[in-house]
Amino acid sequence: MSPLKIYGPIRIRSMQTGITKWKEGSFEIVEKDNRVSLLVHYNTGGIPRVFQLSHNIKNVVLRPSGIKQSRLMLTLQDNSFLSIDKVPSKDAEEMRLFLDAVHQNRLHAAMKASQGSGSFGTILGSRTSQKETNRQLSYSDNQASSKRGSLETKDEIPFRKVLGSPGRGPIKTVTGGGMAVTRTIPSLTLTSTPLRSGLLENRTEKRKRMLSGSELTEDYPKENDSSSNNKAMTDPSRKYLTSCREKQLSLKQAEENRTSGLLPLQSSSFYGSRAGSKDYSSGVTNLDRCNVSSQTPSAKRSLGFLPQPTPLSVKKLRCNQDYAGWNRPRVPLSSHQQQLQGFSNLGNTCYMNAILQSLFSLQSFANDLLKQSIPWKKIPFNALIRRFANLLIKKDICNSETKKELLKKVKNAISATAERFSGYVQNDAHEFLSQCLDQLKEDMEKLNKTWKTEPVLGEENLPDTSATKVFTCPVITNLEFEVQHSIICKACGETIPKREQFNDLSIDLPRRKKPLPPRSIQDSLDLFFRAEELEYSCEKCGGKCALVRHKFNRLPRVLILHLKRYSFNVALSLNNKLGQQVIIPRFLTLASHCTESTKPPVTLGWSAPVAISRPLRACQMMNSCITSPSAPSKKFTFKSKSSVTSCLDSDSEDELKRSVVLSQRLCDLPGNEQYQEDVEKDLKLCRLEPGKAELENSGFDRMSEEEVLAAVLEISRREASPVLSPEDDDKPTSSPDTGFAEDDIPEMPENPDAMEIEKSKTITEPGPASFTEITKDCDENKENKTPEGSQGEVDWLQQYDVDREREEQELQQALAQSLQEQEAWEQKEDDDLKRATELSLQEFNNSFLDSLGSDEDSGNEDVFDMEYTEAEAEELKRNAETGALPHSYRLISVVSHIGSTSSSGHYISDVYDIKKQAWFTYNDLEVSKIQEAAVQSDRDRSGYIFFYMHKEIFDELLETEKTSQALSMEVGRAARQAS
């Protein structure tokens, strides 16, 4: 049957990857064993993405996109969204009909009715294989380079098999369940020998596998019985082939010792077997690399020999001379996976990098921050929560330079509130963590207050709208817990409860007794919650002594413990580090510090019901099934003359004509004065409610340019709203995953003069008449018409040249001044960074010998030691490995400090990745894998901050991840079987 494959720009949106950019590629249908899959290939190479279609299609939409072209949009059951644009309308319609058949379970009936016809019956019509061949060959001819073409072929290798017949014939590329494309290539034939994959050749070897003498005698004359070919038997290349037979004999023994599953080498599979042992394991790929046009018409050989061997053709046989990739061994698939990369050190910012890596590893924290549709446009541009979320989203998909800029913005947002973190001085990681969490809570509190006071479009008809204006704070939901302090009078027993909220606990080092083994973090935690006596005046009986007990009133999802390893030295005015060994258990238990009324952690389920129930703008939706790259509301306002001119200045005359017609229609509207007043009102309304315009234009991504213009014109007639440029149609302003706009990354210009220049150029809210004048001026400038007046053409040209020269001089001067200022600023920043780095290295080297710390007692006489019974000690020891006791917490991250003082040294973080189910060490930019046992043993003297997750929450996240991975593997296995 004919293959079903279409080509064009592709964009995919899914829960795992977010939204991708438009990339050239193809959609290919694969059907086998009553299962239908969609393979997405990219021209840039890489592993094809597989999407199961059987019982998985939610919606199929086909829309026009240009002249005789269409855009096909496919929505799956998990709200994954696939789009392919610029597809010929006929091909797109056939694909839509096929997908509809799969959706309605009509595929197999249709295929059974048309079995053996080479088509999909009424679904696909009579598509011949030659037609598909022409389209595929013409498409491959239009590629930018042969490298891209080869990568595209490589991309399709895992799903193709090469079949053929002896002698001259077509090459069939088999795909999926019998779908094939026939390419007729003269003088080239592939036999039915399977691909010899897995045979790797030594890079140092430059020998060629040749045929044995008997095989050559049997096959070669039969394929070459013309006079020209018989003459070629005596030319120099014949001698070359003879000499190669001896080499073949030396390789014969090695060939016999290879895997028994591989078939013996045959004459016509010379290149096929060689390609199987190189980077490109497909015969089709090797054919693409052969220069077919250079062969003589009389050549009738099989693929094993080049026609009319000459020194030039012999040179071409040695492919390694032209392309080094032929000699390169096949790289394992695992090496193609993206290398993990941490955060760059901006200059003594290792404390920030370590804390950010530990926080970002908390999957529930990240979900609460990104998946509750926070209205980011209502949050100030430099707010920490906005910078924080932006870095969290892009840390795994952007390059190191972009990541460095995002880190600077996070640091600036912190420094704006806490000046001690400005500059490049080493700071305490725990202080940074506390400041970060407090600032995130403040930002969320401000957002909720703003959200309650401002009216939201579309909520007038919703019941109980006040309850829909609350967003969950990720810090409160995941990290905050509540402790109840009960003050009990020892005289009368009067109890006074007091509650206190914490984001983390600062616990003391437990005192170590020489004969006993080192204490653990469990001991320090129990030490914190021990009952203690204090002086307290009882209001009831006047007693002066009371007992204080501490119990958890509400548990967190993640418990952060700060181990106080520093003691202040009064003489030196320094915080000396205590290197006492503290055992790091895998599990902690809070059972002895909880009561029957203790509330468990907030259950998973990131979607706050009140926040999700509200009507969301498309730019805020994480899992929306419709992409909405509508322009920001600021683009709905009338722009300055210069900006409109630049917008209309295009090489396309049709676009200019459409703009002129649009402006004339606006001028023809009745009541220009009333129209101007309405425009001013709408502009003010857009400033107050920027989301309104976005809601009205959320569907522009699906429309063509003509439809967008018509829609905007209709809106302007009905509501007197400003006009949206059609050029903004295909420029997404936000990601459907998070709602962040693309302009979140660049900063505002720091030069105030540049901002003043922009303000001076802006014409405030011109009416339709002025818009028409601007368009006409643009038209005149584009046509280079001479203005009417008393001056002649020569005078006007001279004046034009003078003005142009003056403008160029002013532009050059401004550019030179800007470059000088930029260079001076960069030089100053580099000098500061260099000095800070040198200072950090010097302090680190001085304190490195002291980094191991002292194994002596903490020396804190005020700290009591915890005493356990033998049974309690044994139970705690077992729980440290199993987590069997109630309210157990599992270790998921450790922030360690290497050094002797808090103002020097270096911070690193060890993080457990739930998705990869492995531990990783983040040392600024370097990331390495580490075993959990190594974390527990290597950080017992340097561990500073510990993150423990509630065992039930951890198990639920881990089970969810395992289920997701198993499902992905099942889909991949089904796709491989279908191929």
Curated annotation (Swiss-Prot):
Residues 116-178, 192-240, 719-795 are annotated as: Disordered. It holds the Pfam family UIM. A motif (D-box 1) lies at residues 71-79. Disulfide bonds: none annotated. A motif (KEN box 1) lies at residues 32-34. The active site is at 350 (nucleophile), 906 (proton acceptor). This is Ubiquitin carboxyl-terminal hydrolase 37. It comes from Mus musculus. The lineage of its organism: Eukaryota, Metazoa, Chordata, Craniata, Vertebrata. The gene is Usp37.
